[in-house]
Amino acid sequence: SVGSVYMPDGKTFWAQPFAIGDELGGQKANPQQMAAIQPMPDDSKFGGMSPGANTTIGIIATSAKLTPAECKRVAMMAHDGFARAIRPVHTPSDGDTIFCISGGTKEITDGPRRSRELGEIGAAGADCMARAIARGVYEAQS
């Protein structure tokens, strides 16, 4: 993705509000800094990039028994995790993609409640995606 996983201070993750404990180092955002944040990086970051040149790929795996259409919905919802962790995201230079796979070992409710349960899976997927992106960067070693 063209965007950054860090706030402008270079050490606070965009996904910090979704962290559990100190998994991302415990760095907290400065509210005054948040008010002054520019959403797009400077122009030099975009020079000569072709569409899809900065692709972020992810996968959501669930044990819930989902249809292909439901997997697609969960993957769509998980894109919120990209937006929570990377700023900006889904620019014309990005080819961001998320897949969802269903292990099919756990039945979820049929009928009207199924939609709610599917929403819960997608929302949890988005939270996990945000945390996974930030943790991947935080835990990476060069």
Positions of PLM-derived features:
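A structural signal for small-residue-enriched, beta-sheet-centric alpha/beta enzyme cores
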Residues: 1-142
